[in-house]
């Protein structure tokens, strides 16, 4: 990775970490760009240059959460070689546990309504779904699953869209939604991707 790209990625991570820290202390409605720039140790101008606006900052944070879903499912694929049901169950369970504890998600679900945050996971969700799905597609193509691009893309988009929908409406506490999702999606992989190798 070129130096400039690595420096930019580090800057974004530092800013998003700072936002997460602030959200552990107060609601999203009380967090300003000045607060974030101070906590991250960067100028407000740098913050605006990188994210464009407060909404852009929230989108960047949501995209990082979606990439954590991709990481959770990707890690689970490699931890459960030959067991797509186990991989999906583990990946969803890890993501749901992480998102339930995430300060931005907690802020979205508590206190006053936050339409600007809700837009990110509903109307404007393509900003999250498209890049996260692209990464997850590669995971399904380049792992033991070895799905075709078409099958991997269908599966990845479905996983990301379903998981993101649970951010705004968390899974029921008396139900193993991760298990349900694995049961729902595993047959697609077994019938399409894995059947081609049998």
Language-model-derived ranges and their functions:
Residues 97-101, 138, 142, 157-176, ...:
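Amphipathic C-terminal alpha-helical segment
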Residues 32, 104-110, 117-120, 175-176, ...:
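Short, hydrophobic secondary-structure boundary micro-motifs
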Residues 1-10, 186, 193-198:
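N-terminal intrinsically disordered/low-complexity leader segments
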Residues 60, 74-102, 156:
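Hydrophobic alpha-helical connector segments
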Residues 40-51:
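Short hydrophobic/aromatic patch on the recognition helix
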Residues 15-23, 69, 73, 95:
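Short hydrophobic clusters on alpha-helical segments that form packing/core surfaces
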Residues 1-39, 56-59:
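Basic, helix-initiating cap at the start of DNA-binding domains
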Residues 70, 103-107, 116-146, 150-157:
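Amphipathic alpha-helical packing segments from all-alpha helical-bundle domains
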């Amino acid at each position: 990775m070129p130096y400039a790209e690595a420096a930019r990625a580090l800057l974004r991570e530092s800013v998003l970490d700072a936002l997460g820290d602030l959200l552990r202390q107060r609601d999203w409605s009380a967090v300003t760009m000045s607060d974030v720039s101070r906590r991250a140790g960067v100028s407000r101008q740098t913050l605006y240059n990188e994210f464009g606006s407060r909404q852009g900052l929230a989108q960047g944070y949501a995209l990082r959460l979606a990439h954590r879903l991709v990481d959770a499912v990707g890690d689970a694929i490699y931890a459960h070689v030959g067991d797509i049901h186990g991989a999906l169950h583990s990946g969803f369970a890890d993501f749901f546990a992480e998102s339930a504890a995430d300060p931005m998600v907690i802020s979205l679900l508590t206190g006053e309504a936050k339409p600007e945050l809700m837009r990110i996971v509903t109307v404007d969700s393509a900003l999250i779904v498209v890049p996260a799905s692209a990464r997850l597609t590669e995971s399904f193509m380049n792992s033991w699953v070895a799905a075709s691009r078409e099958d991997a893309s269908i599966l990845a988009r479905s996983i990301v869209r379903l998981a993101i929908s649970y951010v705004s409406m968390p899974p029921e506490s008396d139900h193993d939604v991760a298990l349900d999702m694995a049961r729902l999606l595993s047959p697609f992989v077994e019938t399409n991707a894995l059947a081609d190798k049998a």
